[in-house]
Amino acid sequence: MHTFTSRMDVLPAEQRQVLRLLGPTRSMGFVLYGGTAIALRLGHRQSVDFDFFSSRPLDKEAIRKSLPFIARATTLQDRPDTLTVLTKSNVKVSFFGSINFGHVEEPEQTNDRLVCVASLPDLLATKLKVLQQRVEAKDYEDVAAMLRAGVGLGVGLAAAAKMFAPAFQPAEALKALTHFQGGDLQRLSTKEKQSLIQAASAVRQLPAVTLRSDLGLEAGAFVQSQMPPAYTQSQPSTAVTKKPRQGPRMSI
């Protein structure tokens, strides 16, 4: 599995402390998604919680055994395939199981081998879906940061369309990226708004992407790959292309 240099420096001290305890999540099949995953990759903003996804059913006892600080934390939500806790240092950590929306690029480990983080195309796809569920400036900031990093908006839209069909409609996401109304969107800078409008206006046709049927941490996931991930175009693949079952609705 490839590694990347994480931007741990943007995290609050309490969150950095928790991150150093999360090493066992890799062998348990968890991949980090959400704002903190994007922040670790790009360092563009602070994000104060952790959202871990797994294709496997959630084994809460195994989580508590492998991560003792989770057992000592305050439980905020405990239901099938979902566990959310608040640590003693007030950091929220969530685990979601049976997430079967798939992935289009392989996750990577942080260079300190602490956690596995979803690829930028997959993070963009999930953020584009979130735009249809809520109106929060941080989600638009995340999308703008990933576009600045070179992720193609068309790739993110195509991935989201495959991952979340039929609920996700690319046209609705494009509309959201050009109309900034509601919530706290007044926080967005003029530059961010202009970049989002420009990117949305440039989309003409969605590229072909190959959807793999898990989150990338199944058996053999830690074998070193010889091919680096491509963030702006899809690569030929022999992976399964059928649409996987969707996991539970969530905001990330």
Residue ranges and their predicted role:
Residues 1-252:
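Compositionally biased terminal segments of proteins
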